[in-house]
Every structure is written in C-alpha cells, then in structure tokens.
Amino acid sequence: MNLEVVVQLGSLSLIVLAGPIIVLLLASQKGNL
C-alpha cells in the first residue's frame, strides 16, 4: 500500500470516529446553556 492511501484511510477513520464525539460535545454544550 502507498503512504498516501494509508494517510487517506487514517484521516477518514479519524473523521468517522471524531464526528459523533463532536456532535455529543455540541449537544452537551447546548444542554448546559
């Protein structure tokens, strides 16, 4: 596998993992307000 492919897969996995976490953080902030 090429390094570029590994980087792209890594960035996609990070986005997929970070997406729900960011949504939960935003929801908790709105709930506190």
From Swiss-Prot:
Q: Which InterPro entries match?
A: PSII_Ycf12_core-subunit (IPR010284)
Compartmental location:
Plastid, Chloroplast thylakoid membrane
| Coiled coil, from the record | none
TM segment ranges = 5-25
Pfam families, A to Z: PSII_Ycf12
Check the record and name the HAMAP family matching this protein: PSII_Psb30_Ycf12 (MF_01329)
NCBIfam families attached to this UniProt entry: PRK13686.1 (NF010239)
Q: How does it assemble?
A: PSII is composed of 1 copy each of membrane proteins PsbA, PsbB, PsbC, PsbD, PsbE, PsbF, PsbH, PsbI, PsbJ, PsbK, PsbL, PsbM, PsbT, PsbX, PsbY, PsbZ, Psb30/Ycf12, peripheral proteins of the oxygen-evolving complex and a large number of cofactors. It forms dimeric complexes.
What is the protein's name according to its record?
Photosystem II reaction center protein Psb30
Organism field: Mesostigma viride (Green alga)
Upper classification of the source organism reads:
Eukaryota, Viridiplantae, Streptophyta, Mesostigmatophyceae, Mesostigmatales
